């Protein structure tokens, strides 16, 4: 099923380039540069901004300001009217101005189609202050806007509410439009609240206009005074006041956020584009917390594990035999190892005491094994002359799975094969 996009660029099917070819091509229509915010395509945010401004102007000067007493109505007309007129002028000016770079406005023909950017020939659209699409030299802070299809001098951002880029030529008109909108909304909210409260507290204060002398009853109100008085009910007046208050509060929050942000940018001497680039390049503190710490060296690991890991004792299942291992890896020792040690020690009629010789391997594990042998009565005088030496530097057997647990049977085999001059046994047959 084919997905249709009404807002995308439509492709037209043309004849093959070669007369002999049978396959047609999909060719996109040429792309032209936009002059200002009134150039097509228009954005939906433009109409939303126009509708909100028109609604607030109508309810302010058609409903609420005429209901004020004579001294206050003149002040409201002057203050709110000045803010609304200033906003309208600056808004329209920011939309109408062409913010393109001076060389673009001098040399570029907006009616000619834009060339296609080839990233195999040029790494960036603007290379060495030369725009490959506009085909002109631009200023250092100029950026090529993909929506307007041209280079903008002192580029700040592309505003959807203006449908135009905000650059060096129209930035202060944009800033004035935002500031005047904030001032106008701040003046409008107290006016709406005053009318809403006085409607219940003292309606006579709002009915001082001469046209109210012909109206009977407090349930009927007049709007669009004094030019075209229209009667309406109290419910309609209150509903419009409630909608106006909510819309004004929402607009005030958004506009104040935008105004404070641009005041901060002006204090830092940067543009919106530069602020976004810095944010992208700065490291994220959350990512720093997720990075695991670097592992210490092997020696430090062995020492820390000696202090932190308690020794595992296999003495519980073996009443007269004990073995102690200090392991590098964490976790309990499996029971088959203790059983294997029991079989190996029982085969040679040996028993371990609490005295042990320690064998250390750099970067690996630390193992404690006893070296005092318990022999029969006839062999004890010979064994008393035996001198037991530590096995410093002897190779040991390591588990092929990467664990630091040592096979006890193989250790006994090394003791039997490598030190026959020290230890001598007679294996008794049953």
Curated annotation (Swiss-Prot):
One of its GO terms (cellular component) is endoplasmic reticulum membrane. InterPro entries: Palmitoyltrfase_DHHC, PFA4/ZDH16/20/ERF2-like. The chain crosses the membrane at residues 47-67, 77-97, 177-197, 235-255. It is a multi-pass membrane protein. Residues 129-179 form the DHHC domain. The DHHC domain is required for palmitoyltransferase activity. Endoplasmic reticulum-localized palmitoyltransferase that could catalyze the addition of palmitate onto protein substrates. This is Palmitoyltransferase ZDHHC11.
């Amino acid at each position: 099923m084919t997905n249709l996009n009404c807002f995308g660029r439509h492709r037209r099917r043309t004849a093959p380039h070669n007369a002999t070819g049978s396959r047609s091509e999909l060719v996109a229509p040429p792309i032209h540069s936009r002059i200002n915010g009134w150039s097509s395509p228009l954005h939906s945010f433009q109409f939303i901004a126009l509708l909100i401004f028109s609604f607030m102007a109508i309810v302010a000067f058609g409903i609420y300001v005429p209901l004020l007493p004579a001294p206050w109505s003149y002040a409201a007309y002057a203050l709110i009217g000045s803010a609304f007129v200033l906003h309208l002028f600056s808004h329209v000016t920011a939309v109408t101005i062409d913010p393109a770079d001076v060389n673009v406005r001098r040399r570029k023909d907006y009616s000619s189609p834009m060339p296609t950017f080839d990233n195999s020939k040029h790494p960036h659209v603007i290379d060495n202050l030369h725009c490959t699409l506009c085909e002109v030299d631009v200023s250092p802070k100029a950026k090529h806007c993909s929506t307007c299809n041209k280079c903008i001098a002192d580029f700040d951002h592309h505003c959807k509410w203006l449908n135009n880029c905000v650059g060096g030529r129209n930035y202060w008109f944009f800033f004035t439009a935002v500031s005047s909108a904030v001032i106008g909304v701040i003046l409008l909210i107290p006016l709406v609240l005053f009318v809403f409260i006085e409607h219940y507290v003292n309606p006579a204060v709002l009915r001082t206009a001469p046209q109210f002398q012909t109206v009977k009853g407090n349930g009927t109100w007049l709007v669009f005074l004094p030019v075209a008085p229209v009667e309406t009910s109290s419910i309609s007046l209150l509903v419009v006041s409630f909608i106006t208050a909510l819309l004004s509060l929402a607009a005030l929050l958004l506009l104040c956020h935008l105004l404070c942000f641009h005041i901060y940018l002006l204090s830092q001497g940067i543009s919106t584009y530069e602020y976004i680039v810095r944010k992208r390049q700065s490291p994220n503190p959350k990512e720093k917390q997720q990075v695991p710490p670097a592992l210490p060296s092997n020696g430090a690991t062995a020492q820390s594990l000696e202090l932190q890991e308690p020794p595992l004792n296999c003495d519980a299942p073996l009443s007269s035999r004990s073995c102690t291992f200090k392991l590098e890896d964490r976790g309990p020792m499996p029971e088959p190892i203790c059983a294997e040690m029991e079989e190996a020690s029982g085969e040679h009629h040996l028993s371990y005491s609490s005295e042990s010789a320690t064998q250390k391997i750099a970067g690996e594990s630390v193992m404690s094994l006893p070296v005092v042998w318990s022999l029969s009565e006839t062999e004890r005088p010979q064994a008393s002359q035996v001198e037991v030496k530590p096995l410093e530097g002897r190779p040991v057997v390591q588990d092929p799975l990467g664990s630091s647990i040592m096979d006890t049977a193989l250790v006994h085999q090394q003791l039997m094969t490598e030190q026959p001059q020290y230890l001598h046994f007679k294996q008794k047959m049953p």
